[in-house]
């Protein structure tokens, strides 16, 4: 994933988003039982450890139109990517939120009053955010993982994870069974893909921060050229099943696709494993169980970065992933073999270009416009109600010359696409006038989605009918969080002059 060649407002969408809530996944053999998920997943990004984003609350299709603003809280952090790009977690009536300066706040859900704040003032491109577990709030800055006391915000430990100057951290951690999971990525806030960066997933002891094991998502040899190559890494919190496995998606290889020096990725021959992949490991040891690569030898920054959604459909345990190639893939969770694939959004036939370049057949790649572009496809996490998958889509192109150089694309628009989890067929879609950089969230028979220009939409999960729209005071590039009768929407980036980012709490009846 790269931030080069795009204006500031568009860059924010590259900071992938996570959303957080409290819910259990019912009827999912691949993940934990519903009861276990509710306890283990409390405060987990993606709602639960299966990353279903299926929240518990009193909001449904009969009353969602009664949502009104209850309170607001200014977002004052400063970075090149706005003030905020992650959804807070909500645990026992307290919101835990991290801004794009890496600062963490605990906020009273009822009143919006700040209970405590931990300042780091370390600008981050995002997505970042926190996970709450075992009395601690776990998070990251651009170079360390840390644990804070859940009640006071006092730092318990901090662990340096970077192995070189070409690496950074841009994710909310995962937490499971006494371990915290954090990945580096081969890019920094100041220099995208400087070369030599290896995306590495670390498992840390939750009590001490001590490193237990690590998994290199790409080889340290970097396919033969450690000066300019790099790649992989995890941008989103991983998922876990009840068999002790961890699932995650990975980023693209570098150099950045389309650079004049290496337009077809000549410096990194081969498929560039394990980039653009879903990977399953033993969570206790880091042992590789299987991998699936969606885009070998990626040329277009088509990360397969979404957190896998774990569920059961038609008696089969599935791990459903997606990324910037704009293809949703359901894999058999036991074997990693594809069950179905569903392209979403706009495509125009460049899916095999990486394979052509890998075979030395670059002349067969057609110059012109490429869909999805570098800011297109599925950028944000998906959600599910157990039978339908809700996919946020960004439609936007890039251009490619006959010599392999990439250029800027055009305007971005968005969609929310509902896919039957069993068959992979599209049930309905809703189009937005701006990009869908935020993850959808399900609560009962309602799915809540956001559009970059500052809108929050509620749709009926079965029909796709629009039920409610909220207008925010600034742009939003993340999903909402839901608890009880309240929706928390971080409007984290000014998209027009005079706008001021702030968190808006919507509540039934105001």
Protein language model regions, located:
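C-terminal motif of bacterial Sec signal peptides marking the signal peptidase cleavage site
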Residues: 24-27
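Bacterial signal peptide processing site
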Residues: 29-31
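Blade/loop signatures of beta-propeller domains
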Residues: 34-70, 405, 411
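Repeat-blade elements of multi-bladed beta-propeller folds
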Residues: 39-47, 81-103, 122-145, 168-194, ...
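A structural motif specific to WD40 beta-propellers
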Residues: 70, 113-117, 154-158, 212-213, ...
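Surface-exposed loop and turn segments in beta-propeller and other repeat-based domains
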Residues: 72-78, 120-123, 160-164, 214-228, ...
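Short loop/turn segments that connect beta-strands within beta-propeller blades
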Residues: 108-111, 149-152, 206-208, 283-285, ...
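Conserved blade-ending motifs and adjacent loop-strand segments that build the rim/top face
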Residues: 298-299, 348-350, 357-365, 431-438, ...
